[in-house]
């Protein structure tokens, strides 16, 4: 993917907002958040791999500048993206009644235990306003997630 000059300027500006020290660099452990702020949705595993599988210590202490970050962003942008249909199909497996809903409690368990595990506060934020008498309409839920 080639980004336009305007996009790169926007990316650079966003990158700068994460520079807490003022040295025009960010910590390795901020890279995933910056990518997500720029509309990407990499897994933590993807980002760790792109960073060269750094140790926990390196994640906290190593820093990189925008020129090192941009090729990483391009790499993430090129990764295959899950589609609306992919997510709906994945949730349909949990639709026991075949009525377009999944149990909220079951969805919470899935989000906290499978794949890239989410924390309780992350799940609460994601599911805010999505439960209707203990059930979640998963097509609406996927639309909600994809618009966040």
UniProtKB/Swiss-Prot annotation:
Keywords tagged on the record: Acetylation, Motor protein, Muscle protein, Myosin, Repeat
Entry-annotated residues carrying N-acetylthreonine: 1
UniProt domain EF-hand: residue ranges: 6-41, 82-117
CC per GO annotation: contractile muscle fiber; myosin II complex
GO MF, one example: calcium ion binding
SUPFAM superfamilies, A to Z: EF-hand (SSF47473)
Cysteine pairs bridged by disulfides in the record: none
Further comment found in the protein's record: In fish, myosin MLC1 and MLC3 appear to be produced by two different genes unlike in birds and mammals, where they are produced from a single gene by alternative splicing.
Subunit structure: Myosin is a hexamer of 2 heavy chains and 4 light chains.
Protein's UniProt name: Myosin light chain 3, skeletal muscle isoform
The species this protein was found in: Chelon ramada
């Amino acid at each position: 993917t080639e980004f336009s000059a305007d996009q790169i300027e926007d990316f650079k500006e966003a990158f700068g907002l994460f520079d807490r020290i003022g040295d025009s660099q960010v910590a390795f452990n901020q890279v995933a958040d910056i990518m997500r702020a720029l509309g990407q949705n990499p897994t933590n595993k993807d980002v760790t791999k792109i960073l060269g599988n750094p140790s926990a210590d390196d994640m906290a202490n190593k820093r990189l500048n925008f020129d090192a970050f941009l090729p990483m962003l391009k790499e993430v942008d090129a990764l295959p993206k899950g589609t609306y249909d992919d997510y709906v199909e994945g949730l349909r497996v949990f639709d026991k009644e075949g009525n377009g809903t999944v149990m909220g409690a079951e969805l919470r368990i899935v989000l906290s235990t499978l794949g890239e595990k989410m924390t309780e506060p992350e799940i609460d934020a994601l599911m805010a306003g999505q439960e209707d008498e203990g059930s979640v309409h998963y097509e609406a839920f996927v639309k909600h997630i994809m618009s966040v």
